Amino acid sequence: MRLSLISLVGNKAGEVYSFLLSLKEQENQNFEVILVVNKKTEAKSIFKVIQQFYNFFGSRLVVLVNSKNGSYQANLQSAFKIAKGDFVSVANSDSAIKKWYVADLIEKAIRYNVDVLEFKPRLIGTIRFKPHERNQLDKVFDLNKDKIVYAYTFPFIFNKVFKKSLVKKVLKYNIETTNDTKMCIELNYALMLEAKKYKYLDYRLNREFISSDLWLNPSAFLKTFNVLEKNVKQFYPKLTDEIKYAKYYFIKLLLTGFLSETYFVYRHFYKTDKANLEEKRSKILVNKQKEMLNKIEQSPEFITFISSNPYMLVDNVESKMIKEPYKSLRNSKILDLLE
């Protein structure tokens, strides 16, 4: 089997139906789908939907019930353990999939045959983000030599394709941040650190839907990157500069943009989404982000980072914005400036 597709989101029966229907209509059927059901109140309805597709998919449709701690990354590790495809990728049930998606993904995975194949991410829904290419990554990189990839790879799991031989290397990885999101940041970098060959393609293969119930907790994200930094210092000391740059790119730019630039329609017109956003992207969290970044900006570590990190010496938009004080940065359209 060529491909294992993993959906970490199984919250709504209607979304699961549309997702499985779109997979049934794929031009290339050389894949399996591993579906995580992670909402107990919807489980009965979701299983009824799944039954409708068992005759078509047979053993190619595998269902996992949410882990005890509800961690996306724990669920992803469980899916990795049973994945049979030569390549593995995350495709969530709340995102629409074109009928050529699998064929294109498999063709590119076979053509480049790298440990990690990354596509341009495209976020839609409550967050709209279509970033430009962050650096010239238009070749196959040897990650033992080309450290730049670790600074500029996007911190998401859902825009990448991994070799099965790579995902098997993180089955026993001890995930320290269980208060996570569908981005799976810690496991994403754990995979990158184990990889040997990498390729970036500057076009989107799919659009990732960001719903209103995505928690954006600044302290949880900071903890994730602190864990990554600790691991890198211990096991990959030559990548310290790259991971530190990745940390501040996410914490100061992306997270600030995600918290402050929620798409207007969801914020004001959809009742359920409005209620979710008032909780999960509330002024309390925005203020926590403000306090956290003000503290970071005054720290000796950040001051040294600004002046000496090699990626901060590169003259580009994102390095300039990282240098900018949060009090002025927060009034910018950060996500637009990164496009």
Task: Enumerate the predicted regions with their spans.
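Membrane-interface aromatic/basic loop that binds lipid-linked glycans or pyrophosphate carriers
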Residues: 266-339
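Nucleotide-sugar-dependent glycosyltransferase catalytic core
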Residues: 179-180, 200-230
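Acidic donor-binding segment of Leloir-type glycosyltransferases
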Residues: 20-65
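N-proximal low-complexity "stem/linker" segments adjacent to membrane-targeting elements
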Residues: 1-22
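Donor-binding/catalytic cores of nucleotide-activated saccharide
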Residues: 96-190, 194-197, 211-216
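Glycine-rich, basic loop-to-helix element that forms the pyrophosphate-binding segment
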Residues: 66-83
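Cell-envelope/extracellular polymer assembly enzymes that use nucleotide-activated donors
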Residues: 2-6, 32, 186
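Short aromatic/hydrophobic "clamp" motif used to bind/position activated sugar donors
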Residues: 88
